[in-house]
Amino acid sequence: MLGAKLDTSSGRVWFFPNGDPEISELHVKYDPNNMWSTRMKAIARTALDYFDGSVLVGFPDFGGILDIAASLVGTEKLLFATLEEPEEVKRLCDEIQVAWYDAMDDFSELLKCQGCFTDWNNLLSKTPTHVIQCDFSTMISREMFREFVLDYLRLDTKKLEHEIYHLDGPGALMHLDDLLSLEKLSAVQWVYGAGVPTAAHWIDVYKKIREAGKQYQIKQVVEDPFEVYEVMKKVGGTPYSQLNLRKSDSDIMNKILSHK
């Protein structure tokens, strides 16, 4: 919606810069009549009409501010720019955040007829809400996170209610203390990623989140669906865990339904 190129050949959507723009020359603004804005709103309207209240239609995934910046100028160029042109990076991020809020307002107007809101995280809110994130943060230091990311997240938590931060991968854990300093942040969704130990290995992370007065979301794996119960026993609180099952997982489903 802000001008990046799309690649869907892998079955997923990946974003790339449109050419090789200089950050100082790049200015962004949300256009509600942009081809992709119009298309996504048309899809949402069709879903609203077709399902007629039996399905809740959510916000598109708008992404994180620095993640969007990386898709517009390129990850490597953005990394160098944080060192060589920090004020231009902040100026671009300011513009992206304004556009982000404008997009939220635009889609909120369309979706408010449902009486509540949701996004890709599948949680319900009476007011507009959206998972906040910065996957780019795995490549920057704690000091740079405070300089380029934290204030935007703080504003997000003040503007929107029930905000959950998507903390993605062990490389991002160094920013947890700063995230927990956000007074109005509601919860942290810890995604430990592939190829690393699952939820039970991260008890200290969940405890730290709870001790800061935040809720936590466990991204569960189908191989061990009861692991969430073990985490709850040790950490406490009421985590949210989403488990995607197929028809072939009937044995696991029956165990869950009969579990006490």
Predicted features by range, described:
Residues 7-8, 30-260:
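Active-site loop segments of alpha/beta catalytic cores
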Residues 1-26:
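A contiguous, low-structure linker/loop signature
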